[in-house]
């Protein structure tokens, strides 16, 4: 019989989800009772050399060395530990394919062979093979990763202040009941500053180190900061158009941060910005875009303004744009 070729593409889902997809592939192959070969295709870093097509980034060679070490020794659990930010800076395009293949060999003893690595033109290429040798109960890597992740989330929850705790409780209550958490259920446990002051608030949600939702208000629209957090936590988890609504089975994996915005002030130009200290608001007519300060992957003022322009729908070369800056008090961390 002729071999059957099944092509499966990657996605923007998490590394854990791709590993899980690999497990499902293995389950399907097992039910068919056929010999199966899995090919995980994709380049390594595209940022190995200045003269290469995508330039140089320090994370490029670091990624290639790390991925070849991991794959060369079949340490598949470590594939799940690569952060989204690191992979993005490295400019790789194969990591999710590799992770899916690894998932298909979860719980299996594997004989790895590292055949080659090269990157002569600024893009990394590696070849490894893996031969399944039978079962190995010490190699259920996704289960171990999820247990570690849950423990880390639990420790973060223990350290949450009132702002972050309220954001978490607000979204969890909504996901469970489809109703907003009533103020009388939480107000007695909140510090006075959350009940007496008004400010714009952004709530950010991360999962596996990647953004899962972020919604906020530039100026206050609720009676106090606590109400602002409740509204924006639910909006970030349910109504951010970039992501599907948070599911109940995700709640224990989420990490929250709350940014309370200070007063905005107009500035003359980019020279008055600092990406670590100040957020920026870019405006033209009715178009307005905001970007918070001190975000992973935003390292220059030019990047910061460019992203804010994009969010506002203002072209990169459009004139007549006004800039404002603001500071925030950040509660929690960004994943």
Predicted segment positions?
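Flexible, D/E/H-enriched segments
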Residues: 1-24, 31, 50-165, 245-249, ...
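Acidic, glycine-rich active-site loops and adjacent beta-strand->loop/helix elements
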Residues: 12-13, 44, 262-264
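Short glycine- and Lys/Arg-enriched binding-loop motifs that mark or flank ligand-binding interfaces
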Residues: 38-39, 90, 209-212
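A structural signal for small-residue-enriched, beta-sheet-centric alpha/beta enzyme cores
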Residues: 41-52
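Basic nucleic-acid-binding interfaces
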Residues: 148-335
């Amino acid at each position: 019989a002729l071999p059957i070729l099944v092509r499966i593409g990657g996605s923007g889902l998490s590394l854990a989800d791709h590993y899980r997809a690999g497990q499902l592939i293995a389950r399907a192959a097992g039910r068919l009772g056929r010999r199966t070969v899995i090919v995980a295709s994709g380049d390594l870093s595209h940022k190995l050399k200045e003269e290469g097509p995508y330039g140089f980034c320090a994370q490029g060679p670091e990624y290639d060395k790390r991925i070849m070490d991991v794959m060369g020794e079949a340490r598949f659990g470590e594939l799940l530990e690569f952060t989204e930010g690191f992979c993005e800076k490295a400019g790789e395009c194969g990591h999710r394919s590799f992770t899916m293949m690894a998932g298909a060999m979860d719980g299996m003893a594997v004989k790895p062979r590292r055949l080659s690595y090269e990157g002569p033109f600024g893009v990394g290429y590696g070849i490894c093979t893996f031969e399944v040798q039978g079962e190995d109960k010490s190699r259920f890597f996704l289960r171990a990763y999820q247990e570690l992740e849950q423990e880390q989330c639990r420790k973060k929850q223990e350290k949450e202040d009132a702002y972050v705790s309220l954001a978490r409780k607000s979204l969890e209550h909504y996901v469970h009941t489809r109703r907003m958490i009533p103020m009388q259920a939480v107000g007695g446990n909140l510090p006075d500053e959350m009940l007496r002051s008004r400010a714009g608030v952004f709530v950010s949600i991360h999962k596996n180190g990647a953004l899962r939702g972020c919604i906020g208000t530039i100026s206050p629209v609720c009676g106090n900061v606590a109400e602002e957090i409740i509204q924006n936590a639910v909006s970030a988890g349910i109504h951010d158009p970039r992501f599907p609504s948070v599911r109940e089975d995700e709640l224990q994996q989420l990490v929250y941060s709350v940014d309370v915005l200070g007063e905005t002030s107009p500035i003359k130009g980019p020279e008055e910005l600092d990406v670590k200290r100040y957020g920026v608001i870019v405006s033209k007519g009715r178009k307005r875009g905001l970007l918070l300060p001190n975000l992973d992957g935003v390292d220059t003022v030019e990047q910061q303004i460019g992203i804010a322009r994009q969010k506002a729908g203002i072209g990169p070369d459009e004139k007549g744009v006004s800039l404002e800056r603001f500071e925030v008090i950040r509660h929690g961390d960004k994943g």
